[in-house]
């Protein structure tokens, strides 16, 4: 039996499906993340503030810069070095998670190119050519297969490269590349940067917070411009580059009269194949023989975002809804791969009829059925999982599915935005730049990240995004933050008229887009990097990402991946603010480095703001300051261009 719930006064969520299912959890004596957090409270203040050191067996040491007896650890280390070590170790873990995802995709990609992965194929040949060019590969009249093999080998090579720099850095603006080179931040190989952090943070090695952060930046950049970018680009080539697509989201997408399968995790190699198999007429026939009307596939967390933006597969919910999905009693199989999968899930599944299936050797779980996924036998493994769900359908007990879901438009890849703005034959970011310059759009914000039970579920995402779009800031989203806003209806074109400021609403209506754009899963933050780079290269808004009227935020973060993402945005020149908690607040010197001094080095900086209204104000103020620096802070007279004037502009 799972943990028993306890009374909670603070609102757990603003999502009505969550609130509706809480009594179900209480009745079944199923504790959730909220219950377990309450039992853990009060949490260790030293750990929360980043000043607990467990690196050697002379400790653990708890440091406090104010109390004389706690100023130094046993080895003499101070709080700033401890916080820096802990922080860059979080970067290493986050970068390793995203980059190992990228490695797995590269391996599947290469197997596909060699014809060794039945069921997978090269779907976007145009993007294959573009990636090959960016990797410095000669195209000539080579076959698609030959080109794909070299792309796969070159991407896999980025992980073990020893000298660097990694090739995708050349995609960044030239000024940004020069900054990285000047400060010795160019990643060599993805794996090398993670290993070097672990060496530097061993007892008695790197004891300089500035030097530690130099390596932290290099490792984070190896994630954003390396491992994550590899994952995004190669997934687009073999699964298809996302285009605008209609979908539905929230727990109400589960169906009482159909076999329900949830794919949860991050790597789309498995979920793509389950999506294919779930539509197989033979499998649907088998489901009907068991009394179901069909097979309903849904996604959770970033697996949801992956298959939503390519196929319109319903999105069941974000991070803090994974336990509640099982509490509906309607899930016949939940299959998981890696990352953000709560340890409690097998215990909760055991309270119902649900079969909980793990599929990745990196992520086995006690109480789970393990079916190892292999790309060379993907179809048969997917059939095995779908068959398990079909066979389990008759075993259901009571079912309680909240009748709440919402439409959304997903699929806004960097390429799609390009075409939407400029047209199929003249794809360009110029209309976006023009509308930023003329003030209709105030700026750009990336709002991304997780959920955290320390704050009311989804509330900070929604409050921040609504405030930003009301002030004419267009919002780009990934991950669980994207799901939060999708459930609120903010990813529909009509949301612009309801929530956006006059200028942004006008642009959204003209182009036919929502004011909040779904750009994918957490690895797809690399799409936001590419979009920012495209804006710079289009011209008129400076010559570096740090010049843009843009900001980033993760208001409800909880994962080490979020720290790596935040650092690669900061190191790329973006002001980045996190909410809820921040893991360096017990080290004033190191925090000052991140929040202030670091901007002089890389043009971007960190910030922490638990009050989401203040967070929005800080982001808008930063955007306004960047507009002023560009000289576009004052509205300009509108000019109606005749054809001759337009030709002159085009020339």
Regions found by a protein language model. Name each.
Residues 2-651:
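Anaerobic metallocofactor- and corrinoid-dependent redox/one-carbon enzyme cores
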């Amino acid at each position: 039996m799972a943990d028993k719930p306890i009374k909670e006064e603070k609102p757990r969520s603003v999502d009505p499906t969550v609130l509706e299912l809480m009594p179900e959890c209480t009745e079944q004596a199923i504790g959730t993340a909220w219950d377990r957090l309450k039992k853990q409270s009060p949490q260790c203040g030293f750990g929360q503030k980043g000043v607990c050191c467990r690196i050697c067996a002379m400790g653990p040491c708890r440091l406090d810069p104010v109390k004389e007896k706690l100023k130094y650890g046993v080895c003499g280390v101070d709080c700033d070095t401890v916080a820096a070590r802990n922080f860059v170790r979080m970067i290493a873990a986050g970068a390793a998670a995203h980059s190992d995802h990228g490695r797995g995709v590269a391996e599947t990609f290469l197997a596909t190119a060699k014809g060794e992965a039945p069921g997978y194929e090269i779907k976007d040949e145009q993007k294959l050519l573009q990636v090959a060019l960016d990797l410095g590969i000669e195209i000539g009249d080579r076959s698609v297969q030959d080109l794909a093999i070299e792309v796969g080998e070159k991407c896999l090579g980025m992980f073990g490269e020893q000298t660097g720099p990694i090739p995708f850095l050349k995609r960044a603006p030239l000024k940004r590349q020069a900054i990285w080179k000047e400060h010795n931040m160019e990643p060599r190989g993805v794996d090398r940067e993670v290993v070097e952090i672990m060496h530097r943070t061993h007892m008695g090695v790197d004891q300089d917070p500035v030097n530690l952060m130099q390596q932290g930046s290099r490792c984070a950049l190896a994630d954003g411009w390396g491992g994550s970018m590899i994952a995004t680009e190669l997934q687009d080539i073999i699964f298809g580059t996302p285009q605008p697509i209609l979908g539905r989201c929230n727990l109400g997408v589960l169906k009482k009269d159909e076999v329900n399968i949830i794919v949860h995790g991050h790597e789309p190699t498995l979920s793509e194949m389950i999506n294919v198999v779930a539509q197989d007429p033979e499998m649907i026939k088998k489901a009907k023989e068991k009394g179901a009307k069909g097979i309903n596939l849904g996604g959770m967390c970033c697996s949801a975002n992956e298959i939503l933006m390519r196929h319109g597969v319903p999105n069941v919910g974000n991070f803090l809804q994974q336990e509640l999905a099982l509490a509906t009693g309607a899930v016949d199989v939940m299959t998981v791969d890696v990352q953000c999968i709560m340890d409690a899930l097998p215990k909760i599944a055991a309270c119902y009829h649900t079969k909980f299936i793990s599929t990745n050797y990196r992520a086995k779980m006690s109480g789970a059925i393990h079916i190892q996924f292999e790309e060379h036998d993907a179809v048969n493994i997917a059939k095995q999982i779908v068959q398990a769900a079909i066979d389990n359908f008759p075993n259901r007990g009571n079912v309680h599915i909240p009748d709440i879901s919402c439409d959304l438009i997903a699929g806004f890849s960097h390429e799609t935005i390009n075409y939407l703005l400029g047209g199929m034959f003249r794809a360009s970011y110029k209309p976006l730049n023009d509308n930023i310059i003329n003030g209709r759009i105030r700026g750009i914000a990336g709002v991304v990240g997780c959920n955290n039970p320390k704050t009311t579920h989804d509330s900070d995402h929604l409050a921040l995004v609504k405030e930003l779009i009301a002030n004419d800031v267009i919002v780009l989203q990934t991950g669980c933050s994207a799901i939060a806003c999708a459930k609120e209806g903010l990813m529909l074109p009509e949301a612009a008229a309801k929530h956006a400021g006059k200028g942004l609403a006008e642009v959204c209506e003209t182009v036919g887009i929502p004011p909040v754009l779904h750009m994918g899963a957490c690895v797809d933050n690399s799409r936001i990097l590419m979009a920012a780079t495209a804006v710079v290269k289009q011209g008129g808004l400076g010559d570096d990402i740090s010049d843009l009227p843009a900001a980033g935020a993760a208001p409800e973060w909880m994962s080490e991946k979020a720290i790596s993402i935040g650092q690669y945005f900061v190191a790329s020149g973006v002001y980045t603010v996190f909410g809820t908690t921040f893991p360096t607040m017990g080290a004033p010197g190191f925090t000052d480095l991140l929040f202030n001094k670091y901007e002089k080095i890389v043009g971007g900086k960190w910030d922490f703001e638990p009050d989401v209204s203040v967070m929005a104000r800080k982001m808008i103020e930063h955007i306004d300051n960047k507009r002023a620096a560009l000289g576009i802070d004052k509205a300009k007279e509108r000019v109606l261009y005749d054809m001759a004037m337009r030709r002159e502009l085009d020339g």
